């Protein structure tokens, strides 16, 4: 929702405007259980600076504090199509997550993470569970942004043929230097190993025309070291591609 306009760029959807009018070679925003990233790239230095300005302003000065409608549009709100119609819940992310929760593959992937890492942030769904999204209030939403969308809780990477010192000085003067340091512990502790194997059974929805027969998923999951072991991570990435993802994989 931070990409729905900001103090300096009060347009409804700056992302769409950048896609249409910039020289970017990459432009996106992605959410994960433990982070959200806002990557940009351009071969033109002036364009890259413009992209930096739009994204920094979006992250640190979004219009969400001015317009509750952004939360209602992207998160959730009640709708009534007519006086006789039932009250329904609508919202961009809410509808996206309803779709994700109706996909057996997505349901299985979430259950794998939840069962392996129940005591960590990886047990959570970054987009939210549609059953619980309507429980989120506007005030809680703003409090989350104030606490976590802070320079002390961010990593900013610059890479390429540029004057890095100039970029850092601009970021400090325009944004980072205007914040006070806060104590924020973002460490993600490792999941405590289980004392014995655990079995989990979970139901997923099917259409009225589908049969329950031969429609069961079985998954065996185990934790192997951490993603910080680069060689092991790469080895299993290759193994996954060879056994599962590659054309003709068994």
Where are these regions (language model features)?
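Acidic/histidine-enriched alpha-helical segments
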Residues: 35, 62-96, 163, 183-197
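Structured mid-domain segments that build the active-site/substrate or prosthetic-cofactor binding neighborhood
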Residues: 206, 216-250
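Short, solvent-exposed loop/turn segments at the edges of secondary structure
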Residues: 20-22, 31-35, 88, 117, ...
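Second-shell loop/turn segments in exported
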Residues: 2-5, 36-43, 76-81, 130-131, ...
């Amino acid at each position: 929702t931070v990409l729905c306009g900001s103090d300096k760029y009060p347009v409804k959807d700056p992302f769409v405007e950048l896609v249409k009018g910039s020289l970017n070679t990459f432009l996106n925003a992605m959410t994960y259980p433990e982070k959200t990233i806002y990557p940009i790239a351009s071969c033109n230095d002036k364009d890259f600076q413009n992209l930096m300005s739009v994204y920094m302003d979006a992250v640190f000065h979004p219009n969400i504090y001015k317009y509750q409608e952004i939360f209602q549009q992207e998160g959730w709100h009640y709708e009534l199509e007519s006086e006789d119609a039932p009250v329904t819940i609508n919202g961009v992310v809410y509808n996206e997550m309803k779709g994700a929760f109706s996909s057996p593959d997505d349901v299985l992937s979430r259950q794998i993470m939840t069962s392996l890492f129940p005591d960590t942030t990886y047990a959570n769904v970054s987009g939210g569970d549609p059953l619980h999204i309507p429980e989120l209030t506007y005030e809680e939403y703003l409090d989350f942004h104030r606490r976590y969308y802070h320079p002390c809780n961010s990593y900013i990477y610059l890479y390429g043929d540029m004057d890095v010192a100039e970029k850092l000085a601009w970021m400090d003067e325009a944004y980072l230097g205007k914040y006070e340091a806060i104590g924020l512990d973002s460490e993600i502790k490792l999941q405590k190993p289980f004392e014995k194997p655990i079995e989990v059974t979970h139901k997923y929805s099917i259409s009225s025309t589908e049969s329950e027969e031969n429609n069961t998923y079985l998954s065996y999951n185990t934790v192997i070291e951490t993603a910080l072991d680069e060689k092991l991570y790469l080895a299993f990435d290759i193994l996954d591609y060879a056994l599962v993802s590659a054309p003709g994989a068994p």
